[in-house]
């Protein structure tokens, strides 16, 4: 995958959860809402997790009830509902996670550049900051 995100893969995973809510348990072992690139997909996934935690059905009506129309346009939910569910969901989930980690690494690269030129920070402080951020990424992706 050349890119650090795929809207179609995100849509397919959300569609699979909608059509087979039992899949959410496996997905939750790998993904967090922040792993989704599209803000609307993050929000929809958050709502799915909340519904699951509240022992409520994960379906279109309950999702719409909990979504704020300012956050997610109905057309996005319709695109998810019209997407074909996938059979090997975990392979798609791993692609989303991989892209998420790469985006975090790209952000860290920007942070490294800023920290490296920060005059008020010693080299050891800069290293500690960078190592801390890298550690967060590595433990979150495991």
Feature-to-residue mapping (PLM):
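Noncatalytic partner-interaction/assembly domains of nucleic-acid and motor enzyme complexes
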Residues: 1-99
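Interdomain "pre-motor" coupling segment immediately N-terminal to P-loop NTPase/helicase cores
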Residues: 84-142
């Amino acid at each position: 995958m050349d890119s650090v995100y795929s809207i179609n893969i995100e849509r397919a995973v959300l569609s699979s959860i909608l059509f087979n809510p039992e899949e959410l348990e496996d997905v939750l072992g790998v993904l967090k809402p922040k792993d989704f690139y599209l803000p609307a997909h993050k929000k929809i996934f958050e709502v799915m997790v909340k519904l699951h935690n509240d022992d409520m059905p994960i379906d279109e009506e309950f999702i719409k009830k909990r979504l704020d129309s300012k956050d997610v346009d109905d057309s996005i939910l319709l695109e998810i509902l019209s997407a074909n569910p996938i059979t090997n969901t975990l392979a798609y989930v791993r692609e989303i996670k991989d892209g998420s980690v790469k985006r975090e690494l790209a952000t860290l690269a920007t942070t490294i550049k800023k920290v490296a030129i920060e005059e008020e920070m010693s080299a050891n402080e800069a290293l500690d900051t960078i190592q801390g951020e890298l550690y967060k990424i590595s433990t979150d992706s495991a």
